[in-house]
Amino acid sequence: MKAVLVINSGSSSIKYRFFELETYSVIATGFVERIGEAESRLKHGWLNKENKYEEIVETEYVPDHGKGFDWIVDVIARTSSGVRVHRVLEA
């Protein structure tokens, strides 16, 4: 499966959607909020193998946007079977 991760980054949050490229359907969505605060929060929802929606919420300290993005990549890798994540940076 080919997919693309679309990011919208604000001053203390990162929102994202993960799209499957053949049908342009959303296969995962979520956000990291309160970046830089003691209890940053990640909310992630995705379609499982049975095409049913699942959701998790996690909290931990995220000091900056780089660590927030790493958290997003980790949760996508944990919840989406067969997904390989490649980081691309454009400035």
Where does each model-flagged region fall?
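A short acidic Gly-Thr/Ser loop motif
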Residues: 7-12
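Extreme N-terminal starter segment of soluble prokaryotic enzymes
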Residues: 1-4
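Short phosphate-binding loop-to-helix
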Residues: 63-74
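Short glycine-rich, Thr/Ser-proximal phosphate-binding strand/loop in the N-terminal lobe
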Residues: 13-62
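Short beta-strand-loop/turn "lid" adjacent to the catalytic site in phosphate-handling enzymes
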Residues: 72-91
